[in-house]
């Protein structure tokens, strides 16, 4: 057996449970296995795994299952945050950032290309089982919008705003809410990196007073508000609220198209791990950051789109196998987002599975002598059930 020597190690990391796989059961696994038996090697491995078309706007069905390259410059400006940690490790290991073109992202790109900005923003929701690639599909969409010169409002993990926060301060604006200055300041730095070209063009439409000595006058660049939040960390939460309010208000003027992209959207409803000094729990709506982000999720503005993804990884107080919108959002969250267009992200299909294996082989990530064989591929299929995250983790040990 190809993986005999590492079975014990793998089992420590993830005990395989056939009951875990809801969408991709025995039938689907057998389908991919049959594909591996019957495939005819008419294309080179590189043609299977890669495309030379690196512009997301030009991606179509013909590119499905192939990897495209994100330039180092785009990686630095579009994704100062938001890429999954293990994908970042892979980028460093392979010295390149390659995303697979998948059907959920292609569906979203089709919708966004045909957006009518005169109508209220449409909400799209990526959902699926754990490890199927929701975050990377969201990143594909973000890359597309950035290359189309949209302004990107990206929240890479909303769960970080509702748990394990180091500093909570009573809001100076509303005593019933709490500020999270460190989280807000970090987000503003990344927002500035991605959208710096817009920050001098957009002017604030009212005066904002920070303290007795400092204020931002009406007509000042939005960049001044961002800088205030970065340099005066105590004001960072208020600065985020102002940025969101100004963008929502001005998106209809036609100066820019706005993408609101939120990963882990289910964090905005439900429970938090945060407590007051008297140990009583803090509700999400009591956090100023969450309060303001919830406003952005309403489709009472136009000039852009709202794309979000559900996440089990950081979700609190939810069953491990929950993945459906009504399960992770709860009634309050579901009602708040309704209506939305749901987009399912599933495990790899046969073409995607083969492409992923070939990509790892090209980068010498699979060193075992049986890795390129049909027997080896079937073992990897059995171990991972074609789940992208599990496949990546198992391949890391070969």
UniProtKB/Swiss-Prot annotation:
Expression tissues: Ubiquitous.
Q: Give the chief site where it resides.
A: mitochondrion
What's a single GO BP term from this record?
apoptotic signaling pathway
Superkingdom field: Eukaryota
**One GO cellular component, as annotated:** mitochondrial inner membrane
> What broad class of enzyme is this?
hydrolase
Keyword Ribonucleoprotein in the entry? The reply is yes
- Per UniProt, the transit peptide runs over 1-21
Q: What is its EC number?
A: 3.6.5.-
Residue ranges under compositional bias (Basic and acidic residues)?
A: 52-66
Region described as Disordered: spans on this chain: 39-67
Q: Which reaction does it catalyse?
A: GTP + H2O = GDP + phosphate + H(+)
**Record keyword GTP-binding present:** yes
**SUPFAM superfamilies xrefs:** P-loop containing nucleoside triphosphate hydrolases
Kindly list the positions annotated as binding GTP: 100, 128-135
**Sorted UniProt keywords:** Acetylation, Apoptosis, Deafness, Disease variant, GTP-binding, Hydrolase, Mitochondrion, Nucleotide-binding, Ribonucleoprotein, Ribosomal protein, Transit peptide
Which residues, renumbered to this chain, carry the PTM N6-acetyllysine? 175, 207
Where in or outside the cell it occurs: the entry states: Mitochondrion
Supply the Pfam families for this chain: DAP3
According to the record's subunit comment, the protein's assembly and interactions are: Component of the mitochondrial small ribosomal subunit (mt-SSU). Mature mammalian 55S mitochondrial ribosomes consist of a small (28S) and a large (39S) subunit. The 28S small subunit contains a 12S ribosomal RNA (12S mt-rRNA) and 30 different proteins. The 39S large subunit contains a 16S rRNA (16S mt-rRNA), a copy of mitochondrial valine transfer RNA (mt-tRNA(Val)), which plays an integral structural role, and 52 different proteins. Interacts with DELE1. Interacts with NOA1.
Disease cited in the entry = Perrault syndrome 7: A form of Perrault syndrome, a sex-influenced disorder characterized by sensorineural deafness in both males and females, and ovarian dysgenesis in females. Affected females have primary amenorrhea, streak gonads, and infertility, whereas affected males show normal pubertal development and are fertile. PRLTS7 inheritance is autosomal recessive. Some affected individuals present with neurologic features.
| Alphabetized PANTHER family for the sequence | MITOCHONDRIAL 28S RIBOSOMAL PROTEIN S29, SMALL RIBOSOMAL SUBUNIT PROTEIN MS29
The UniProt entry's sequence similarity note says: Belongs to the mitochondrion-specific ribosomal protein mS29 family.
Name of this chain's protein:
Small ribosomal subunit protein mS29
Q: Which organism is it from?
A: Homo sapiens
């Amino acid at each position: 057996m190809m993986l005999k020597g590492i079975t014990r190690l793998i089992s420590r990391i993830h005990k395989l449970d056939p009951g875990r796989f809801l969408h991709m059961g025995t039938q689907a696994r057998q389908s991919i296995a049959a594909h591996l038996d019957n495939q005819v090697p008419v294309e080179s491995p590189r043609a299977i795994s890669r495309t030379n078309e690196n512009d997301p706007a030009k991606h179509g069905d013909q590119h499905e299952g192939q990897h495209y390259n994100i330039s180092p410059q785009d990686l630095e400006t579009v994704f100062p945050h938001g890429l999954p940690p293990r994908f970042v490790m892979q980028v460093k290991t392979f010295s390149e950032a390659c995303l697979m073109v998948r059907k959920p992202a292609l569906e979203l790109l089709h919708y966004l290309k045909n957006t009518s900005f005169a109508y209220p923003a449409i909400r799209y929701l990526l959902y699926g089982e754990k490890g199927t690639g929701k975050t990377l599909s969201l990143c594909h969409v973000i890359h597309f919008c950035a290359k189309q010169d949209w302004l990107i409002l990206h929240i890479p993990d909303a769960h970080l705003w509702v748990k394990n926060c180091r500093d909570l301060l009573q809001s100076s604006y509303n005593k019933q809410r709490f500020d999270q200055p460190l989280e807000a300041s970090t987000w503003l730095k990344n927002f500035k990196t991605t959208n710096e070209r817009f920050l001098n063009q957009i002017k604030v439409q009212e005066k904002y007073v920070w303290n007795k000595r400092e204020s931002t006058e009406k007509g000042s660049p939005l960049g001044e508000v961002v800088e205030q939040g970065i340099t005066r960390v105590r004001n960072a939460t208020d600065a985020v609220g102002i940025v969101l309010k100004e963008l929502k208000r001005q998106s209809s003027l036609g100066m820019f198209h706005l993408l609101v992209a939120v990963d882990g959207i289910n964090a905005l409803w439900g429970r938090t791990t945060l407590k007051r000094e008297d140990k009583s729990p803090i509700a999400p709506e009591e956090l100023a950051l969450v309060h303001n982000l919830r406003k952005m999720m309403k489709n009472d503005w136009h000039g852009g789109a709202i794309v979000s993804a559900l996440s089990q990884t950081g979700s609190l107080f939810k069953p491990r196998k929950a993945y459906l919108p009504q399960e992770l959002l709860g009634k309050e969250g579901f009602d708040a987002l309704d209506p939305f267009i749901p987009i399912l992200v599933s495990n790899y299909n046969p073409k995607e599975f083969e492409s992923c294996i070939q990509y790892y082989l090209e980068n010498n990530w699979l060193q075992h002598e049986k890795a390129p064989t049909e027997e080896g591929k079937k073992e990897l299929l059995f171990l991972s059930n074609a789940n992208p995250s599990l496949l990546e983790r198992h391949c890391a040990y070969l």
